[in-house]
Design a protein with these regions (language model features):
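Catalytic His-Asp segment of secreted/periplasmic serine-dependent ester chemistry enzymes
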Residues: 108-180
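Active-site segments of SGNH/GDSL-like serine hydrolases
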Residues: 66-72, 90-119
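Conserved SGNH/GDSL esterase-like catalytic core that processes O-acyl groups on lipids
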Residues: 1-85, 109-115
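Solvent-exposed, polar/charged alpha-helical surfaces in well-ordered, non-transmembrane soluble domains
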Residues: 8, 12, 16-19, 85-92, ...
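Loop/turn elements at helix/coil->beta-strand transitions in domains of secreted/extracellular proteins
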Residues: 21-25, 60-65, 95-101, 128-132
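Extracytoplasmic low-complexity repetitive segments enriched in small/polar residues
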Residues: 47, 62-63, 75-76, 94, ...
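Active-site cleft segment of glycoside hydrolase catalytic domains centered on the general acid/base Glu
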Residues: 77-87, 148-150, 155
Length: 180
């Protein structure tokens, strides 16, 4: 799994949940402030595409890819087409036949941008076989959910569980039959 600070904060819970569901090896790589395709070596930030390139070159390749990026890209790009290009660039690094789950984005301070990004994500993944979108946005947008800390981005303890469940649910749709 490749993600940002949300993923980093949920790493233990995601790993435990996926392990309990039968995966023998779960690797979660989350980093604060990570963006899809923009890194900053001076600050030690590695872009998601760089991590994906490294993972794609490793052997064995992952049975299932999970991407949870976009939070730090929300509000930066001009329109849905720009977000679609960004997402397609990330996907170009991943094997086209590999199962892939992408967890969509929610930021209280960038709701409209998240909606645009998430529509682009849905559109791009609808064209890719063996893909699923985990709907984190919907989880967070429910008024009664109370899953986020006061910053409106990062999950609180209850939100960490909900985020991990969102990941596991998206992966369950894709899990290779031989692993079930």
């Amino acid at each position: 799994m490749i993600g940002d600070s949300i993923t980093a904060g949920a790493q233990r819970t995601v790993t435990a949940l996926l392990s309990r569901s039968g995966f023998s090896s779960v690797i979660v790589n989350g980093q604060n402030s990570r963006r899809i395709d923009v890194g900053n070596r001076k600050r030690g930030l590695v872009a998601g595409t760089e991590v994906a390139s490294y993972v794609a070159a490793s052997h064995p390749s992952p049975l299932v890819w999970v991407i949870a990026l976009g939070t730090n890209d929300a509000g930066i790009y001009r329109d849905g087409a720009a977000y679609a290009d960004l997402i397609e660039h990330m996907l170009s690094v991943v094997q086209s036949t590999a199962p892939l789950a992408w967890i969509n984005t929610y930021r209280r301070d960038q709701l409209r941008s998240c909606e645009i990004l998430n529509v682009a994500l849905n559109d791009v993944l609808a064209k890719r076989r063996n893909s699923a979108v985990g709907n984190w946005f919907e989880q967070c947008a429910l008024p009664e959910s109370r899953l986020l800390s006061s910053d409106g981005v990062h999950p609180n303890p209850r939100g960490v569980l909900a985020f991990a469940d969102t990941v596991a649910s998206a992966v369950a749709v894709l899990r290779p039959r031989r692993e079930r």
